[in-house]
Amino acid sequence: MSYKTNYELYSRGSIDSRRSPPPDELLSPLATLYPHVAALQPQYNPSNCTFTGYRDTGYWAAAYTTQTMDDSMSMRRIDGRPCRFVSKLRRLLSRDELKHRRGSRATARTA
C-alpha cells in the first residue's frame, strides 16, 4: 500500500531531528537568479552552527554588477556596427539636406 510506504518514510525520523541544510545549499538555486539576495545573506559555519558575519563588500559589488562599463564600451568599439549605422544614417541625412538646399536655391533664383 502506497500510504504505508509514505508513512514509513516519515516515521523513521522526526521532522525536527533531521538536519536542515545550511543557507548556502538553500540559496544555491537562487544565487544565480538573484545574486543580490545571496549577497545579503549572513555567513554560516555548519560545523559549529555559528554566525560568522556578512560577506565582504567586494562580494556585494560583484553581485550587483554584471559587466563593467569598460568591457561594454570596448565591445561596442570592436564590433563597430552601431558606429557604421550611425555614420551611414548621417551621410543619408546630409545628402537629403544638401538636395533640399540646392533645390530651394534653384527655385529662389528662378523666382
UniProtKB/Swiss-Prot annotation:
Gene: verU2
Top-level taxon of the source organism: Eukaryota
Name of the protein in its database record: Verrucosidin biosynthesis cluster protein U2
Pathway: Secondary metabolite biosynthesis; terpenoid biosynthesis; Mycotoxin biosynthesis
Biological process according to GO: terpenoid biosynthetic process
Region Disordered: start-end pairs: 1-24
Function comment: Part of the gene cluster that mediates the biosynthesis of the neurotoxin verrucosidin, a methylated alpha-pyrone polyketide that inhibits oxidative phosphorylation in mitochondria and thereby causes neurological diseases. The carbon backbone of verrucosidin is synthesized by the HR-PKS verA, and further modified by the other verrucodidin cluster enzymes.
